[in-house]
Amino acid sequence: MITFEVAWYFSVVFAVALGGAVTTVANLATTVYLHRGLSHKALTFSRPAHGAFRLVLWLTTGIRPRQWVAVHRKHHAHTDTLEDPHSPAIHGWWNVQLKNYAMYRKVARDDSNTDRFARDLQPDRLDRYLFDRALLGLGTGIAILVVLFGPFIAAIAALIHINYYLAANSAVNAIGHHFGKRPYDNSATNLQWLALLTAGEGFHNNHHAAPTSAKLAHRWHEIDLGWFLIKPMTWFRLARVRLDELRLVSAARASHQTN
């Protein structure tokens, strides 16, 4: 009995850690590829890196890149207005935290938004036959976990991943526009703990001050995990950074820090 309980305990701990690891991979792909790369053109990718990111996102999130990009670009074009897809200033931060996914889906499914904000990302043959099939991607990802680790661990890991990914990315839009520090004069905020959970996305104030910068950390003590992936990718020519300099933030946009 003791042996069984110990084995069960370590299986659960491993499954939770596995779910967290899967989410970390998904968050890195989201921030580096979807956000900094496709949405803001801060960096470009080699064909192998481009294909790898598409595959990872398909298996872990089912996201269609052009839809994600369209929603995000609309957010920047209409930040904290009625046209913002997920503004806590309009809807309340707790409402956005709880309903961010529904808000995202509403805008993502509207083809007029994709045509307007992501015209440069036309679907190719792989999108039409594979990557646009979200449920197939998620099902394949779960099936891989089942084959590698068994149904018990796979089920827990998948549950942890889904909840972690949705909650953390909702927090960027909700908490990241309500609580935290504002070293630059915009409505977004910086939160190191949120940045650690989202591979750098918690430095939302920095990002809104310099949206085309590939590096979200602006100060020596800020930890941007996405940048830690980008740098070695540039060494191996898997990515090329176009913009990462703090000169993108003009002195006129800086203000005093507030909590």
What are these regions (language model features)?
Residues 117-125, 183-210:
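Active-site-proximal inter-transmembrane loops
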Residues 1-171, 213-259:
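Non-catalytic, topology-defining segments of multipass membrane proteins
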Residues 174:
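Glycine-rich, pocket-lining loop/helix-strand segments that form or immediately flank
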